């Protein structure tokens, strides 16, 4: 909403310069063109937010369905526990490879001294 030209206060306090036969039509038209652009931008922003709201509402509904189906997932929790153990073993092996190589490099450099 960075491209909004006027606040409601700006519109309320706008003063047009009177001419011999009333206000300058070009001044009024210029102001109204800016107001129209603001309204168009507001409309686009509202439409974008509605679409985002619909998308997020659908996502919440989808996640709620997954959570409500969670009762069957909880019954299979031991399988998840085994999977977690497997992940921890893999992580431990990876750490040994990475940090073990660093330790070997440190030991080799200290033997050179």
Curated annotation (Swiss-Prot):
Record key words, sorted: Cell cycle, Cell division, Cell shape, Coiled coil, Cytoplasm
UniProt keyword RNA-binding present: no
Compartments reported by the entry: Cytoplasm
Record-level GO BP terms: cell division; regulation of cell shape
GO annotations of cellular component type: cytoplasm
Keyword Membrane appears in the UniProt entry: no
Highest rank taxon of the organism: Bacteria
Coiled-coil region(s): 32-70
Main subcellular localisation: cytoplasm
Subunit and interaction comment: Forms polymers through the coiled coil domains. Interacts with PBP1, MreC and EzrA.
Role according to the record: Divisome component that associates with the complex late in its assembly, after the Z-ring is formed, and is dependent on DivIC and PBP2B for its recruitment to the divisome. Together with EzrA, is a key component of the system that regulates PBP1 localization during cell cycle progression. Its main role could be the removal of PBP1 from the cell pole after pole maturation is completed. Also contributes to the recruitment of PBP1 to the division complex. Not essential for septum formation.
Protein's name according to its UniProt entry: Cell cycle protein GpsB
Species of provenance: Pediococcus pentosaceus (strain ATCC 25745 / CCUG 21536 / LMG 10740 / 183-1w)
